[in-house]
Amino acid sequence: MSESYKVISDNRQARFQYEILEVFEAGLALTGTEVKSIRAGKVNLRDGFAQIRNEEAFLLNVHVSPHTNAGQFFNHDPRRTRKLLMHRQEIRKLIGKTEQKGLTLVPLKLYLQRGWIKVTIGLARGKKLHDKRESIKKRQDKRDMERALKRGAE
């Protein structure tokens, strides 16, 4: 991802709820109305997750709003299962890792790169409640230190 890209949707909640172990980039197999809606930014990654079936990766439960100018007949189902376009060796690597207890695949970011819509998938382990509290405390302490430094500089 060294080239420039435009972030369309970011799943910030995933980084709070999960500990991200590894990150993968994948393309998406989309219909025309889905592409138009995603380019307009009408997508929600919050409840989404990825699954691997028959050595193919799929993105489930990601909400892409129906396109406003398309008729009902031509529009897509907002929560349909979408195929992820990944290299075969990446999928095989993920099969072994997702079979481990407690690991899942979550979408982290949806972006536009050179005209192609791509998604960043994270191999993640769910955080416990005390881990979430700890990360909140660290973030609050960091803010307090920055405020104190700012006041000292004035």
UniProtKB/Swiss-Prot annotation:
Keywords: Cytoplasm, RNA-binding
Coiled-coil parts of chain: none
One GO molecular-function entry: RNA binding
Domain of life: Bacteria
Residue span of region Disordered: 132-154
Known role: Required for rescue of stalled ribosomes mediated by trans-translation. Binds to transfer-messenger RNA (tmRNA), required for stable association of tmRNA with ribosomes. tmRNA and SmpB together mimic tRNA shape, replacing the anticodon stem-loop with SmpB. tmRNA is encoded by the ssrA gene; the 2 termini fold to resemble tRNA(Ala) and it encodes a 'tag peptide', a short internal open reading frame. During trans-translation Ala-aminoacylated tmRNA acts like a tRNA, entering the A-site of stalled ribosomes, displacing the stalled mRNA.
Name of the molecule in the record: SsrA-binding protein
Lineage: Bacteria, Bacillati, Cyanobacteriota, Cyanophyceae, Acaryochloridales
